[in-house]
C-alpha cells in the first residue's frame, strides 16, 4: 500500500482533525459532533443553510467546500460509506437560522436513507429540511432519477449556495439546485482502483495497462474494459456520449469541469482539457469559466471525469457569484 496513514481505522478522524487544524480560518467541528464540519464564516443574517455530505475518500468533495457563501456544513461518513442519521440531524441543529436547510448529496441509497432520517428528526424539532439529489453520471442508469452523483456535485452545490447567499427562500434555493442538476452531465474513466487505508488493498481489481470508461467513483462498473488508449481517443469517446446525451448544438454555452480522481497528474488533466476545448470549439459551442483539477476524487484512483453544464444567464450568474472556501473560490 502506497499510503501515508497510521491506523487505517482512525484515518477519517485523523484526517478531520488535521483539516480543521489547517483550515481554522474557515471551519470548525460542530459543538456536539466531530463528523460535522461547520463554516466559521456563515452570514449573521438568517438565511437558508446549505448542508452537503457523504462518505470520506472523495476529498476535497464535501468538507472542502464549507466556507463563505458556499456550504454551511458538511456531514462526513466513513470511507465510501454514508454518514449515519445522527450527524445529518446534528448538522441541521448546528447551522439552522430559522429559514430552513437544504441537504445535497450524490444519489446513493445509503445517503438517501440516512439523510432522510436526519430530515425527519429535524422536522420533529420544527425545522424544515428539503433535499436535492445530484444525478449527473450519465452512464450509471438510463433513468435520470436513478443516476449517481459524481463531480457534478460541485456545480449543484454552488448553484444552491449562490441562491441562498442572495437571500432567496428555501423553495427558490431548492429550485436553483434542481435546475443546475438537470443541466449537469458527467462521465469518467478509471485507469486504476483506489486503495482502502484499512486493508491496504484495492477496492476492485484492474490489471496494469487497462482502463474502464464509465466507471463510478466507488468502482461501479463502466461500459467496458480495454487497453489504455491515448488521451485524445479517451476524451473523444467520453465527449461523444456527453454531447449525444445533451443534444448539444452550435451556439450553446457550457461550463466545463475536468476532474481528477486523485492519482492522475495535472499534466494529463490539461492534456484532456485541451482536447475538450478543441471538440467544443469545432462544434461551435462556447465555453464559460472552465475548471481543471481535483474536485471530487476517489482517494488514489488514477482517472478523470468530464462534466459539461448547459448554461443560461441564470446558471451563469449562480456559478459566478463570489464565494470563498479552502478548495473553491470565485472572486
Swiss-Prot record:
Subcellular location: Cytoplasm
GO molecular-function term, one example from the UniProt record: glycerone kinase activity
Induction record: Repressed by GolR.
Gene3D superfamilies: Dihydroxyacetone kinase, domain 1, Dihydroxyacetone kinase, domain 2
EC supergroup of this enzyme: transferase
Family matches, as SUPFAM superfamilies: DAK1/DegV-like
InterPro entries linked: DhaK_dom, Dihydroxyacetone_Kinase
Keywords, alphabetical: Cytoplasm, Glycerol metabolism, Kinase, Transferase
Role played: Dihydroxyacetone binding subunit of the dihydroxyacetone kinase, which is responsible for the phosphoenolpyruvate (PEP)-dependent phosphorylation of dihydroxyacetone via a phosphoryl group transfer from DhaL-ATP.
Subunit structure: Homodimer. The dihydroxyacetone kinase complex is composed of a homodimer of DhaM, a homodimer of DhaK and the subunit DhaL.
Protein name as it appears in the record: PTS-dependent dihydroxyacetone kinase 2, dihydroxyacetone-binding subunit DhaK
Source organism of the structure: Listeria innocua serovar 6a (strain ATCC BAA-680 / CLIP 11262)
Amino acid at each position: 500500500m502506497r499510503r501515508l496513514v497510521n491506523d487505517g481505522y482512525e484515518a477519517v478522524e485523523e484526517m478531520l482533525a488535521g483539516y480543521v487544524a489547517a483550515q481554522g480560518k474557515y471551519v470548525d467541528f460542530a459543538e456536539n459532533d466531530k463528523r460535522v464540519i461547520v463554516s466559521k464564516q456563515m452570514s449573521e443574517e438568517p438565511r437558508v443553510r446549505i448542508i452537503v455530505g457523504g462518505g470520506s475518500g472523495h476529498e476535497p468533495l464535501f468538507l472542502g467546500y464549507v466556507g463563505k457563501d458556499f456550504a454551511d456544513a458538511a456531514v462526513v461518513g466513513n470511507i465510501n460509506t454514508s454518514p449515519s442519521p445522527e450527524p445529518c440531524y446534528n448538522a441541521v441543529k448546528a447551522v439552522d437560522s430559522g429559514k430552513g436547510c437544504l441537504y445535497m448529496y450524490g444519489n446513493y441509497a445509503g445517503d438517501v436513507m440516512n439523510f432522510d432520517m436526519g430530515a425527519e428528526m429535524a422536522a420533529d424539532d420544527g425545522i424544515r429540511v428539503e433535499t436535492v439529489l445530484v444525478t449527473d453520471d450519465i452512464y450509471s442508469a438510463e433513468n435520470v432519477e436513478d443516476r449517481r452523483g459524481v463531480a457534478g456535485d460541485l456545480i449543484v452545490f454552488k448553484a444552491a449556495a449562490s441562491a441562498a447567499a442572495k437571500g432567496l427562500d428555501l423553495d427558490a434555493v431548492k429550485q436553483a439546485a434542481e435546475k443546475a442538476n438537470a443541466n449537469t452531465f458527467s462521465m469518467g474513466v478509471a485507469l486504476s482502483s483506489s486503495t482502502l487505508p484499512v486493508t491496504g488493498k484495492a477496492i476492485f481489481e484492474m490489471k496494469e495497462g487497462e482502463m474502464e470508461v464509465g466507471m463510478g467513483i466507488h468502482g461501479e462498473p463502466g461500459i467496458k474494459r480495454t487497453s489504455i488508449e491515448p488521451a485524445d481517443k479517451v476524451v473523444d469517446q467520453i465527449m461523444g456520449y456527453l454531447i449525444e446525451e445533451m443534444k448539444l448544438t452550435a451556439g450553446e454555452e457550457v461550463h466545463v469541469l475536468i476532474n481528477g480522481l486523485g492519482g492522475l497528474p495535472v499534466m494529463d488533466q490539461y492534456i484532456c482539457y485541451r482536447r475538450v476545448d478543441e471538440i467544443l470549439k469545432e462544434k461551435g459551442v462556447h465555453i464559460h469559466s472552465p475548471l481543471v483539477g481535483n474536485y471530487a476524487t476517489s482517494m488514489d484512483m488514477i482517472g478523470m471525469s468530464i462534466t459539461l453544464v448547459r448554461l443560461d444567464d441564470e446558471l451563469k450568474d449562480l456559478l459566478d457569484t463570489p464565494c470563498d472556501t479552502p478548495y473553491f473560490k470565485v472572486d
